[in-house]
């Protein structure tokens, strides 16, 4: 079964995004968060979501508790939060909370 090709390092994902001129999709989650679990086990396993994320973005998934520097840098106040960045690091969209697959895809489409 296909899955999202998550990276676990923000800095190397930025380098990769700049080399490939692709946007970054950053998901900040917390272990034990029910909405985070639903997003990861339901939305991120949907074939349409997997295809869209892997083809259009450099996906990064980070535990907010272990990456407080990133949480503070981007002023994230809850989990899960999904952020989309240009290759140069400029934030273009954020959508906090859980989204079922169809709604998640709609959010991704808004990024252009």
Predicted regions and their residues:
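Short acidic-hydrophobic, aromatic-tinged amphipathic segments that line or gate anion-handling sites
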Residues: 3-10, 60-63
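A short beta-strand-turn-helix
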Residues: 6-23
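Typically the conserved alpha-helix immediately C-terminal to a functionally engaged Cys/Sec
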Residues: 10, 35-52
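Short active-site neighborhood of thiol/selenol oxidoreductases, capturing the structured segment around
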Residues: 20-33
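Hydrophobic beta-strand anchors of alpha/beta hydrolase catalytic cores
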Residues: 25-26, 59, 82
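Non-catalytic, surface beta->alpha helical segment in thiol-disulfide oxidoreductase systems
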Residues: 44, 77-112
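Structural microenvironment flanking redox-active thiols in thiol-disulfide oxidoreductases
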Residues: 64-70
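Short amphipathic alpha-helix with an adjacent loop that forms part of the alpha/beta core around
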Residues: 72-74
């Amino acid at each position: 079964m296909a899955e999202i090709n998550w990276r676990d390092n923000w800095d190397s994902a930025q380098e990769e995004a700049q080399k490939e001129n692709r946007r970054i999709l950053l998901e900040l989650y917390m272990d034990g968060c029910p909405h985070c679990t639903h997003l990861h086990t339901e939305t991120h396993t949907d074939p349409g979501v997997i295809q869209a994320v892997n083809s259009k973005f450099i996906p990064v998934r980070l535990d907010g508790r272990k990456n407080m520097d990133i949480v503070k840098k981007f002023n994230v106040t809850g989990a899960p939060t999904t952020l989309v960045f240009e290759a140069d690091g400029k934030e273009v969209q954020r959508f906090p909370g859980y989204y079922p697959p169809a709604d998640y895809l709609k959010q991704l489409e808004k990024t252009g």
